[in-house]
């Protein structure tokens, strides 16, 4: 009997990629192109406002290891040697047009001064034509750098850029040692405009500068597992390496972001617990900490939790770094800027959420997880709430004005890998939160501000009462409100008057709230959207997008309705839904 041979293998398993073997046998590796599919059954997301239909599933090709990497044929599963840091697929999205970024009627005013304002040593050098953006110096196509293995440019890149809709989305995606530039508005979005293959380094995190973007210029920064930072301009195919060979900080970059409103400055979180501010146009120099000459008396009391190794106010700004802050000796997993550009929420593997005034180089508050480390963090569009995800499988909501935990959201069965607000489903009363995790699930949560003032029912009371969902503000002692100048608030329950007088600048340490005092918020929707862990979540005006560990980028179309007009008129009981919709019975809605 004639039997067709099996198709050539597609290499997608990250574990096998790292080890070069599976079950003690060498893995045959064949690199293929990206594959886009349109599942017949789809993966619909049923929510109160309608059904989100799966548009497509774009599967990125996983590159084979570089020839210089010797495969380990028989890895020892009990070996304690740590594997090189890697990351699942994450996306950085950007539109070059006037695409609406949010429908949320935000009243947030950016009053924060620019980072480094007042330090003449950081003043930008004058340029002849301000409209022309400075590009990196090196041509990546002609580069002989050992850091870059190969660059693949689409043969019709110029034509595709000229013919595309300026309102369409570009996406930058990492997958192992590859970095792809995709046009998601193209009919052939599975064909990358360019692909960079690095020799050994994996790009862990990346970000696009919204300030400098134009039809002729895009600034992209990438943080790598080697500690090197890659400044990349894809249209001209120019690049520059920052922190080359770890001259400033040799530990891997875990997260990287442009400072809001800045053309040159960005912050990189390193695995050794340091936040480093870089200038993309400055050269590197061997970093020597600029510790204060005096003893602890000259150091602000708040800095016991933030050691300033180099201040942004330093006059020594001829080379990178601009500033260096040490928060801990453990891994910084993520950070996020507040909408008013004043605060920085930082989460660490040590289980702390640290609220910083990064302009003043101070830690204001320290919150602790219920269990384990934090993995991700984001801000609400109005800056009133911070949401975190962690190794305790929980999504946690924190109130910034009240400086306290509002609710714990239970629904994941494994670590939460990403959280995000959906600004097109938020108004002044209700917020939509999304989360994804290692359990391959996508969860949606609706959080109603109006329910904060309802009296809390005892946790043994019937869970059908909606008042058990949110902890009341009256549960906490009185707190000082922040004035318009942005002064932070203190918790009377955590510090005595004597403490306030002796250490007025000491960060407020918030203990873990007990399960009996903290309310539980159930999801309105829970759905398994793949077979591998989900790593990233993004909301757009007309879509919801996720990306996974093995390279699946999935896009759902929103229900066909004017969501920004209709959503604010829905009742809070409808937005909260019932626990049964998400597969969680109503009887499980007691306190966590």
Curated annotation (Swiss-Prot):
Read off the Gene3D superfamilies from this record: YVTN repeat-like/Quinoprotein amine dehydrogenase
Give the CC-aspect GO terms: nucleus
**Keywords (A to Z) from UniProt:** Repeat, Transcription, Transcription regulation, Ubl conjugation pathway, WD repeat
Instruction: Identify the domain of life.
Output: Eukaryota
BP GO annotations: carbon catabolite repression of transcription
Q: Which residues form the signal peptide?
A: none
Compositional bias ranges of the Polar residues kind:
484-499, 564-576
- Which Pfam families does the record associate with it? WD40
Q: Where is this region: Disordered?
A: 119-140, 459-513, 556-592
What does the UniProt function comment say about this protein? Answer: Component of the regulatory network controlling carbon source utilization through ubiquitination and deubiquitination involving creA, creB, creC, creD and acrB. Required to prevent the proteolysis of the CreB deubiquitinating enzyme in the absence of carbon catabolite repression. CreB deubiquitinating enzyme stabilized in a complex with the CreC leads to the expression of genes such as those in the proline and quinate pathways.
Subunit record text = Interacts with creB.
* Record-stated family: Belongs to the WD repeat creC family.
Task: Please report the name of this protein according to its UniProt entry.
Answer: Catabolite repression protein creC
Gene source species:
Emericella nidulans (strain FGSC A4 / ATCC 38163 / CBS 112.46 / NRRL 194 / M139) (Aspergillus nidulans)
The protein's gene is named creC
């Amino acid at each position: 009997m004639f039997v067709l041979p099996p198709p050539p293998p597609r290499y997608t398993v990250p574990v096998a990629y790292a080890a070069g073997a599976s079950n003690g046998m060498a893995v045959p590796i064949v690199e293929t192109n990206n594959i886009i599919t349109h599942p017949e059954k789809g993966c619909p997301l049923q929510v109160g406002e309608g059904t989100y239909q799966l548009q497509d599933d774009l599967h990125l090709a996983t590159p084979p290891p570089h020839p210089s990497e010797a495969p380990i044929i028989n890895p020892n599963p009990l070996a304690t040697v740590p594997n090189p840091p890697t990351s699942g697929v994450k996306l950085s999205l950007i539109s070059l047009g006037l695409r609406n970024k949010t429908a949320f009627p935000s009243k947030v005013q950016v009053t924060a001064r620019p980072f480094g304002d007042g330090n003449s040593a950081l003043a930008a050098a004058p340029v002849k034509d301000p409209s022309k953006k400075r590009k990196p110096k090196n041509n990546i196509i002609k580069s002989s750098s050992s850091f870059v293995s190969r660059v693949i440019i689409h043969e019709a890149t110029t034509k595709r850029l000229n013919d595309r809709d300026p309102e369409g989305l570009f996406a930058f995606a990492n997958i192992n040692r590859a970095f792809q530039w995709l046009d998601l508005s193209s009919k052939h979005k599975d064909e990358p405009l360019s692909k960079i293959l690095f020799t050994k380094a994996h790009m862990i995190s990346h970000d696009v500068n919204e300030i400098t973007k134009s039809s002729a210029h895009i600034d992209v920064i990438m943080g790598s597992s080697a500690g090197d930072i890659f400044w990349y301009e894809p249209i001209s195919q120019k690049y520059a390496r920052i922190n080359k060979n770890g001259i400033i900080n040799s530990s891997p970059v875990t997260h990287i972001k442009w400072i809001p409103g800045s053309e040159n400055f960005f912050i990189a979180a390193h695995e050794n617990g340091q936040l480093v501010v870089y200038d993309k146009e400055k050269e590197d120099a061997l970093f020597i900490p600029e510790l204060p000459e005096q003893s602890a008396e000259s150091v602000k009391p708040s800095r016991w939790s933030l050691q300033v190794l180099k201040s942004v106010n330093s006059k020594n700004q001829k080379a990178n770094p601009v500033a260096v802050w040490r928060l801990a000796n453990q891994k910084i997993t993520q950070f996020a800027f507040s909408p008013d550009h004043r605060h920085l929420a930082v989460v660490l593997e040590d289980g702390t959420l640290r609220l910083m005034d990064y302009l003043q180089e101070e830690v204001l508050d320290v919150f602790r997880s219920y269990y384990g480390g934090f993995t991700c963090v984001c801000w609400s569009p109005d800056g009133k709430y911070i949401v975190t995800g962690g190794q305790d499988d929980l999504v946690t909501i924190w109130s910034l004005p009240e400086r306290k935990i509002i609710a714990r959201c239970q629904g994941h069965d494994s670590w939460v890998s990403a959280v995000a607000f959906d600004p097109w489903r938020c108004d002044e009363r209700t917020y939509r939160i999304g989360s994804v995790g290692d359990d391959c699930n996508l969860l949606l949560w609706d959080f109603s501000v109006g329910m904060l003032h309802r009296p809390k029912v005892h946790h043994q009371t019937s869970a059908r009462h909606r008042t058990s969902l949110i902890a009341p503000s009256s549960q906490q002692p009185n707190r000082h409100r922040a004035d318009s100048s942005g002064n932070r608030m203190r918790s009377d329950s955590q510090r005595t008057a004597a403490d306030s007088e002796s250490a007025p600048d000491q960060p407020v340490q918030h203990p873990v709230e007990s399960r009996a005092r903290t309310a539980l918020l159930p999801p309105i929707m829970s759905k398994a959207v793949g077979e591998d862990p989900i790593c990233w979540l993004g909301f757009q005006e007309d879509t919801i997008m996720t990306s996974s560990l093995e390279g699946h980028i999935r896009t759902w179309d929103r229900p066909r309705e004017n969501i920004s007009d209709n959503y604010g008129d829905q009742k809070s009981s409808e937005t909260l839904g019932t626990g049964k919709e998400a597969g969680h019975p109503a009887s499980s809605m007691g306190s966590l």
